[in-house]
Amino acid sequence: FADYVLYANKATPIAIVEAKDANHSVSHGLQQAMTYAQMLDVKFAYSSNGEGFAEHDFLTGKERTFAIDEFPTKEELIERYKSEANDGNGLTEQELAVIEQPFCTGQNIFPPRYYQRNAVNRTVGAIAKGQNRVLLVMATGTGKTYTAFQIVWRLLKSGLKKKVLYLADRNILVDQSIQQDFKPLDKVTHKIDYSKDKNHLEELGSYQVFFALYQQLIGQNDAKNYKELFPNPDYFDLVIVDECHRGSAKDDSNWRNILEYFSSATHIGMTATPKETKYQSSISYFGEPVYTYSLKNGIEDGFLAPFKVINITTNIGDEWRPTKGQKDINGNEIEDRIYNNSDYDYNIVIEDRIREVAQEITNYLKSTDRMAKTIVFCADETHAERMRMALANANADMCKK
């Protein structure tokens, strides 16, 4: 990695220095320094052979060489950054406020990885410039919730935002976020429970960060609970949409109604897989991603495990047709037609297929490591319970222990 990273403050790296020996030219390592600088979102790249320096300024696009004793001080680099940013127009007061605000640190809070720092800095920077719709794409397992927390922390502490709504579609996502990554903000955090909160509206004002399930805000029969809880549509100035590809970007989604109600707020969409279809588009709503850290990036950097795809064909798969009189798991005769993989465990449940899949998984684990951590994705909870039982039966020898 880079030989030296120079920081303007704990949140902002400002320069990369690549060191070579005197047998190389002063600019020999400049391209390497520029590569690292682009990776870390750093604006000044330097190379040195011990006798002088070569500089590439990403803000102006210009390069120069200078003597070893002329290297700019931290204060000089910061002033250049402040004045040269935004195509020479300089940084705004809001940009300075978030740049100077450090990340949340503490005994149980690990420092951000380089790509998390990039994601946070890009996001808060875009918001400081006035961008109201922001898309952040990060591969699963790279710390999206931690990144969201650091974004919220810096925006709140810098004063740019005061009231935050964090939207998700599953309880476990909300509860884990509150209990883990957002724990440093627990005194100002509240999980919305419509049945309780509707009777204590005056107490909501004491919180800054609200977590909510879409279902709690929408209510039964599209009751629009969010209007009762928050009659002022300008109540929130920041809305974060977790896994925004699941529905918030769909034009006719009830979830979109929530976003439209709080339309004056800045909206941040976070996803590992931005959805782009005729009917649903993350990019058309949130805009092009301000930062992307892909699965490929994570594997290359060593933060994610590499994988290989093993395709297995089951006897009951695509273009399967039942035999005459064949019955499903409920004992009902299966309709005589062609079935595809998208039908199974949704439109039709066939126990033989579940057993076959469980056996294939078992065979693979027997050939590798039966004690290896394994995740099996299922259609729903009912399917998951059937698969659990099938796996237990296929591994009865292990279950006896």
Residue ranges with predicted function:
Residues 229-268:
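SF2 helicase catalytic motif II
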Residues 172-196, 390-399:
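Conserved helix-turn-beta segment of the N-terminal RecA-like "Helicase ATP-binding" lobe
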Residues 280-372, 388:
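Interdomain helical connector at the RecA1-RecA2 junction of SF1/SF2 helicase-like NTPases
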Residues 111-119, 144-147, 346-358, 383:
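Phosphate/oxyanion-binding active-site loops and adjacent basic polyanion-contact surfaces
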Residues 1-163, 168, 172-188, 205-209, ...:
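ATP-dependent helicase/translocase motor core
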Residues 196-210:
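Conserved motor-coupling elements within RecA-like helicase/translocase cores
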Residues 371-401:
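Carboxylate/His-rich catalytic cores and anion/metal-binding grooves
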Residues 173, 216, 245-246, 275-276:
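Residues immediately C-terminal
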